[in-house]
Amino acid sequence: MADTTGRIPLWLIGTVTGIPVIGSMGIFFYGSYSGLGSSL
């Protein structure tokens, strides 16, 4: 992680790509669970 000159750090790529994916998956699972709970 020391040699990041001229390159994008991997942790930055992982954070930028991971947060929207985890957020969308969380919203999807929360919606499905709340939908199941209201239907039951």
UniProtKB/Swiss-Prot annotation:
Its main location: plastid. It is found in: Plastid, Chloroplast thylakoid membrane. It is a single-pass membrane protein. One of its GO terms (biological process) is photosynthesis. PSII is composed of 1 copy each of membrane proteins PsbA, PsbB, PsbC, PsbD, PsbE, PsbF, PsbH, PsbI, PsbJ, PsbK, PsbL, PsbM, PsbT, PsbX, PsbY, PsbZ, Psb30/Ycf12, at least 3 peripheral proteins of the oxygen-evolving complex and a large number of cofactors. It forms dimeric complexes. One of the components of the core complex of photosystem II (PSII). PSII is a light-driven water:plastoquinone oxidoreductase that uses light energy to abstract electrons from H(2)O, generating O(2) and a proton gradient subsequently used for ATP formation. It consists of a core antenna complex that captures photons, and an electron transfer chain that converts photonic excitation into a charge separation. PANTHER family: PHOTOSYSTEM II REACTION CENTER PROTEIN J. InterPro entries: PSII_PsbJ, PSII_PsbJ_sf. Belongs to the PsbJ family. The chain crosses the membrane at residues 8-28. The keyword Nucleus does not apply. This is Photosystem II reaction center protein J. GO terms for cellular component: chloroplast thylakoid membrane; photosystem II; photosystem II reaction center. The lineage of its organism: Eukaryota, Viridiplantae, Streptophyta, Embryophyta, Tracheophyta. Pfam families: PsbJ. Keywords: Chloroplast, Membrane, Photosynthesis, Photosystem II, Plastid, Reaction center, Thylakoid, Transmembrane, Transmembrane helix.
